Amino acid sequence: MKHYEINKDMRYLQLLAQSFPTVAEASTEIINLQAILNLPKGTEHFLADIHGEYEAFLHVLKNASGNIKRKVNELFGNTLREAEKRELCTLIYYPEQKLELVKQNEPDINDWYHITLHQLVAVCRDVSSKYTRSKVRKSLPCDFSYIIQELLHEHTEDHDKTAYVNVIVDTIISTGRADDFIIAIANVIQRLAIDQLHILGDIYDRGPGAHIILDKMRHYHSWDIQWGNHDVLWMGAAAGNDACICNVIRLSLRYANLATLEEGYGINLIPLATFAMEAYKDDECAEFIPKMSGGAADIDEKTQRLTAQMHKAIAVIQFKIEGQLIAKHPEWKMDKRRLFEHIDYEKKEIEIDGKIYPMTSCHFPTINPASPYELSSEEELLMTKLHHSFMVCEKLHKHIKVMLQHGCMYTIINDNLLFHASCPLNEDGSLKEVEIFPGKKFAGRELMHQTGMQIRTAFQSDSDPKEREYAIDYFIYLWCGPDSPLFDKSKMATFERYFINDKETHKEEKGYYFLLRDDEQVIDHIMDAFGVTGPNRHIINGHVPVRTTKGENPIKANGKLMVIDGGFSKAYHNETGIAGYTLVYHSRGFQLVQHEPFTSMEDAILRGTDIKSTTQIVEMSNRRMLVADTDIGQELRKQIADLEELLYAYRHGFVKESERKK
């Protein structure tokens, strides 16, 4: 017999009784929750480092990392030809566009509707089978909710039921609603195929469509993000950190991909172009010609030259503002990154760590050698305009709000610890203390938590003004500071890569986390420190591209660490040999899905091309995981315990039953 402290819990029980005012209702809820505990766990998808590649990312969401294709093969493997299965998959991924094509080419459209509707219902029935009817119902569009429920839950083995289903299908067609129904059920299939999506950072970067991805995520049913270094850079820009604004613009120009800045957010770059053309009119800006792996292959020579001038102009301003911030915050210990003062402008040389290096060029018309970090009056005016553009961009601030609502520095879910890049360590593998606030040091979980709080402080207008100013400044440390959990390298050698040919200066020494993360004991120590328990616990990261062509393995530390940056970004395709990973965690275990490069949405619609994916089984269980085995299961058991206490209180007269108010 359970012992309850009814008097102590009375206030809570009275509140709970408002939702379940009778013994019957409380009992029914316990039965429902117990039933949910025994369903298979939902499928979690883990993606990382999307870098603005919206077409590939959205396609992976639509095909559920190949899961929908697998379902179609299982259902129709022997009854449909390969081409027909491909057509059906494309219809599920891109229903509106595919319907347009079908109607142009199909001689008997009603017959096609009849067959296709039955096929779609079969796929939907399969993907919905692991959910409660209530959860499926909540996923359905209002217009077709009742009809889809009827079709999903009628078994066609019964002859009378077959006739009933056929009448529903015929009526959908005869009333001219077939297209709308197909679009609705295709979207339901997409939604139910992924129960929970985890993005391990870097929605933003050089790709053309970070804004398109965030428009999609604003309305996505269930997702979270562990912020990456590029996300935090854009958050810093939105918060008003001018060094972050310069970095964001510089990276876009480096890859000649201005779509997110100009088309997505309407950032006006004309003042920068005007300034750059004048200030660098006599400069070849050879080091600043955009990378061909971005959008540069599609621009003419004149535009390329202008892009290079803008690129150099913003880079010089960036180095100046970073120099100012480093001087303002000596506690960051980044003084070595103030490089302008070490340039001999006449000899065109620079001294770094006691060594003299020749520079590729030394044309800096806006630098005053006596005060090298001071912006010229024209640069000041330009930064005022750019700062204003970022601060008044409503869409950017909406997207950053979405990132704050759904994101944090780390997440612990179902015995998995998720973070984008690093957890700073000492040489012996112990957790490294990092100074976030002046005079305050944190390590491990507390470091991640305090960093996340610092980021949020930058966006809270009611914060202490000095604390908020520091939080806004701190974004640049998170981007390139040596002990930042989002960087964790000795330096960011941006200046050296532009101006020094000697590759030795380009080296960025990785922090101890990256050097020790293949050690199972180190990974266990980190998980212990974060309170991650369970026999099948893991750390999941992104950030560092896995170069499969060089034989690198995404599975490390005897299976306890998984690195899933496979290179969504086109710039990394040649390096990684693939175009991204999805880690899929379903009721049977973990599978790592390796994607080949995506051609285009147009190609997928016209020719039915899908992303070719190879699946590697990482960890399989001989027992199917249930909701009871997950974090949600723990929460449901607590709810059941509370309801059982309420039943006891009802039956022993501590709380009175009442009629539900109509």
Q: What is the predicted role of each segment?
A:
Residues 1-662:
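Feature recognizes metal-dependent phosphohydrolase scaffolds
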